[in-house]
C-alpha cells in the first residue's frame, strides 16, 4: 500500500510544504489548519495529462501572516524578488517529489498568489504536463489512474500523541477522460467518523468528467488509532476506463537466476556454492557492473563476503573457509556473483534427520503492493549432493500452477544421491496482488530431509537456516541495490 500511495503522497506534498511553513515543529494552535485543494486533470488518449493543482491556505490567519512575513523578509530583495525566489525553491522541491514517486513531468510552473495583495489567504498554483499519468494494463484491459481522496493521509506516519493542531481540509478532483472513453470505476461515496474527526467522500459523473470531493476534519492530538478508524476501510483509489484502442505499455523485465549447491562431505562438513545471475533489466545490470568497477573488484568481493559471513554466523553456521568471484564484468550479458564456503551447522538436525527449509517463491509476493510494477522471471536451483549411505526422507512436492498467465513451477529430481530442486516464478506486468496470492500465497516454505550413515552425523547442526535460498544469495545483490539508492 505504501508503494501504491507514493504518488498520492507526492500530491500531498503541495499542502505539506505549506503546513510545515505555517506550523513550525512543536508549535501549538487553538485554531485548526484550514486548506482547500483543487486538482484538475485533462487526460490524453495516450495516458499523458495536463494537470492543474491549486492549494489555498485559509487559516489560521495569524499563522498565514507569519508565513507571508517570512517569505518577504529577505535582505536586499523586493517583495516580488522574494516571492520569485520562494516559488523557484518550492517548484524544485515539488518536481523532485513527483519524480521520486515515478511521475515524469514537463512544462512545470508554480505561482504563489495572495501574498501582498490584501487577500486573507495564500494560494499555490502548480501546472505541468505529466507523462503516463494514466497507465494502460493489458493484464486488466483498461486504463487506470490514481485518485486518492485521503491525500495520502491513509498511509502517512502519525506520532503516537498525534499532531498538536486540528485540520480542516477540503479536496476537489476533476478528471476529464479522453474522448470516447468508457468509465468503469471511480471513487464512491464514503462516510466515516471517529470522535470529532470526520472523513467524507462524494462523487458524481457529468458526461466524460468525473468529479470527486472529500472533506477531512481532524481533531488536535488525533493518534494512529483515529487515523486507522477514519481511513483504513477506504479502498477505492482509482479511476478506471477503457478506450476503443488499447494503450501501449512501458515496463521493465527482471530476470534473475539463483543457484545453491550444497555438497555434504563424509566428514559432515558442507561445501556450499552460491550463484546469483543477473540477466535483466540490462540497464540495471550495466549499472551494477559499473559500480563494481568503481568500487574495485577486490573491495566488492570483500564486502559481499563480509555481509554473507556475518549473516551465516548469526544463524549458527560455522564457517571454515570463504571466497567470492564476480564474472561478466567486461562482457555483454549477465553479471554473476559467486561465493564458496566450507561450513558446519548448515542444516537443522531433528532426531537424527537433517532438515533444510527454503522459500521456493524467492519472496516474490513481498515485492507486490497492489499490482506488479514490472515483469518478473525468477529461477531458483538448489542441489544437495549427499555422501554414500545417505537416505532421502522427504522432498518438495511438484508444483505446476497458472493464474491468468502468471506461472509457478517446482520440480524435484533425484539421481543417485544427488537432489536437484528447480523452481520458477513468472509474474506478468500489471498482475493484481490477489492473483499473485492465489499463485503463491500458501507456499512459503518447503523442505529437503535426509539422514546420514551412522557415525557420519554431527551434533553441531542444531540451527535451522530458514529460507537460506532467499537470504544468503540475495545479500550481495542487496548490497549493490542499497548503494544505488
Describe the role of every protein-language-model region.
Residues 23-470, 482:
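Lumenal/extracellular ectodomains and adaptor appendage modules
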Residues 16-21, 480-481:
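Hydrophobic membrane-targeting alpha-helices
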Residues 9-17:
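Hydrophobic core
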Residues 475-485:
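C-terminal membrane-anchoring or membrane-association module
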Residues 1-8:
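Bacterial N-terminal signal peptides that target proteins for export
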Amino acid at each position: 500500500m505504501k508503494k501504491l500511495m507514493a504518488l498520492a503522497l507526492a500530491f500531498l506534498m503541495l499542502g505539506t510544504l505549506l503546513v510545515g511553513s505555517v506550523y513550525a515543529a512543536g508549535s501549538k494552535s487553538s485554531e485548526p489548519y484550514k486548506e482547500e485543494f483543487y486538482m484538475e486533470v485533462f487526460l490524453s488518449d495516450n495516458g499523458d495529462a495536463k494537470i492543474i493543482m491549486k492549494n489555498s491556505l485559509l487559516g489560521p490567519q495569524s499563522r498565514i501572516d507569519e508565513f507571508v512575513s517570512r517569505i518577504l523578509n529577505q535582505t536586499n530583495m523586493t517583495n516580488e524578488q522574494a516571492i520569485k525566489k520562494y516559488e523557484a525553491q518550492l517548484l524544485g522541491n515539488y518536481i523532485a517529489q513527483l519524480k521520486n514517486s515515478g511521475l515524469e513531468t514537463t512544462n512545470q510552473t508554480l505561482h504563489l498568489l495572495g501574498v501582498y495583495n490584501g487577500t486573507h489567504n495564500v494560494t499555490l498554483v502548480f501546472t505541468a504536463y505529466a507523462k503516463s499519468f494514466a497507465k494502460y494494463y493489458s493484464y486488466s484491459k483498461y486504463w487506470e489512474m490514481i485518485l486518492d481522496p485521503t491525500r495520502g493521509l491513509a498511509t502517512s506516519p502519525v506520532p503516537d500523541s498525534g499532531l498538536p493542531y486540528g485540520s480542516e481540509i477540503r479536496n476537489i478532483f476533476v478528471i476529464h477522460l479522453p474522448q470516447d472513453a468508457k468509465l468503469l470505476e471511480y471513487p464512491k461515496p464514503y462516510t466515516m467518523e471517529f470522535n470529532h474527526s470526520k472523513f467524507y467522500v462524494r462523487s458524481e459523473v457529468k458526461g466524460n468528467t468525473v468529479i470527486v470531493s472529500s472533506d477531512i476534519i481532524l481533531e488536535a492530538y488525533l493518534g494512529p488509532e483515529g487515523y486507522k478508524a477514519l481511513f483504513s476501510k477506504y479502498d477505492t483509489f482509482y479511476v478506471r476506463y477503457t478506450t476503443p484502442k488499447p494503450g501501449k505499455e512501458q515496463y521493465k523485465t527482471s530476470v534473475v537466476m539463483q543457484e545453491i549447491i550444497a555438497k555434504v562431505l563424509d566428514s559432515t562438513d558442507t561445501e556450499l556454492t552460491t550463484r546469483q545471475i543477473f540477466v535483466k533489466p540490462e540497464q540495471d545490470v550495466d549499472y551494477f557492473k559499473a559500480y563494481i568497477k568503481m568500487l574495485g573488484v577486490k573491495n566488492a568481493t570483500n564486502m559481499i563476503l563480509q555481509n554473507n559471513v556475518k549473516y551465516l554466523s548469526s544463524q549458527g553456521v560455522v564457517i571454515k573457509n570463504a571466497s567470492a568471484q564476480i564474472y561478466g564484468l567486461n562482457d555483454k550479458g549477465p553479471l554473476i556473483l559467486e561465493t564458496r564456503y566450507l561450513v558446519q551447522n548448515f542444516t537443522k538436525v531433528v532426531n537424527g534427520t537433517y532438515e533444510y527449509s527454503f522459500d521456493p517463491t524467492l519472496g516474490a509476493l513481498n515485492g507486490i503492493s497492489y499490482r506488479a510494477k514490472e515483469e518478473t522471471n525468477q529461477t531458483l536451483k538448489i542441489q544437495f549432493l549427499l555422501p554414500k549411505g545417505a537416505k532421502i526422507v522427504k522432498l518438495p512436492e511438484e508444483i505446476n500452477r497458472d493464474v491468468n498467465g502468471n506461472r509457478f513451477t517446482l520440480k524435484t529430481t533425484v539421481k543417485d544421491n544427488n537432489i536437484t530442486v528447480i523452481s520458477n516464478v513468472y509474474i506478468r506486468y500489471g498482475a493484481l496482488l490477489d492473483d499473485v496470492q492465489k499463485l503463491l500465497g500458501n507456499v512459503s516454505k518447503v523442505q529437503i530431509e535426509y539422514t546420514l550413515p551412522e557415525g557420519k552425523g554431527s551434533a553441531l547442526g542444531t540451527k535451522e537456516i530458514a529460507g537460506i535460498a532467499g537470504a544468503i544469495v540475495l545479500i550481495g545483490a542487496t548490497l549493490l541495490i542499497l548503494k544505488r539508492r
